[in-house]
Amino acid sequence: MDGLHTELALGLIGCCGGDGQQQTAPFVAKTYQMVCDPRTDALVRWGRDNNSFVVVDPAAFSQLLLPCFFKHGNFSSFVRQLNTYGFRKVHPDRWEFAHESFLRGQTHLLPRIVRRKKRGEGGGGGGGASCSFGGGAGEHQVAAAAASVGMSGEEEDAAEDVLAKEAALFEEVQRLRHEQTAIGEELARMSQRLQATERRPDQLMSFLAKLADDPNAVTGHLLEQAAERKRRRQHLPSHEPTVCPLPPAPPPQPPQPLLALAGAAAMDGTYWWTTEHHHHHHHQMKPMTVLPSLEPPTASCGVHQVPELGGGGVMGLTTDGEAKVEPPFPFCLLGQAFF
């Protein structure tokens, strides 16, 4: 792990050698490492006399630092472990802990910090704190330390429970503070939205009053705003897809002439009408005038009865040789018509 203290990297957590040297407990070694690392002084640091350490920000300490060294981020569990190893809280208003063997730069004293045995484990101890050091000298030192503070085993257990409960309450208070902050921010946002909603009817009524008093001024103001928005859109790069212009529409088709009725033949652009003389039994071709269509090709058109030519005749178009007949109203207004 990066950032290990030099003394810890050199073997702060050692194994028992042949001379019976004890090893430092992993919890104690990791705690010493956290306190000694200058990069974590904003969260935890040494006390004024270098014989204690202070957790400056327990909430950030639990969230950022504890998970890097331990398998949890529970501050109350960390405090409970400190109590198990004989640390005590030395200041009522801040999280400052001390141990007689937890001193800055005195790494050779760390193996003396061991987990205390529960009551009933081990045979000695009398009224003192029952801790095991693996040697008579260590037991004597622990007993002397317990006697110096004047605490029995039951009192130490009670103090441990009180500190654990205090740490748990502190964590709960921190959680409630975070929730309160989040709720306050949400209420502020809702208040802003509510105020904006309440202002809209007043703005609408004011606009309607101005429109009723001077419609031209309001219309001119709206036109100015629209022109300003248009100028802004022209200056800003457009993110809308480019629309290709449509091709021009084809020119309209010229009107189609009426098709000749049955019996007419087209020659050199002039329709010819066939008349039949019943008496002489021969055919005669006369030219017919072609009139452009005045209505769409789908519309129906009428024809006029052509007088009999030489004793007989059929329905057809007007010939050039005959006098033009005046068409009825309203066709006479068009200048030319079907008849």
Swiss-Prot record:
Transmembrane segments: none annotated. Its main location: nucleus. Keywords: Coiled coil, DNA-binding, Nucleus, Phosphoprotein, Stress response, Transcription, Transcription regulation. Exhibits temperature-dependent phosphorylation. A motif (Nuclear localization signal) lies at residues 229-233. Gene3D superfamilies: Winged helix-like DNA-binding domain superfamily/Winged helix DNA-binding domain (1.10.10.10). Pfam families: HSF_DNA-bind. Signal peptide: none annotated. Residues 176-212 are annotated as: Hydrophobic repeat HR-A/B. The keyword Hydrolase does not apply. Transcriptional regulator that specifically binds DNA of heat shock promoter elements (HSE). This is Heat stress transcription factor C-1a. It comes from Oryza sativa subsp. japonica. The gene is HSFC1A.
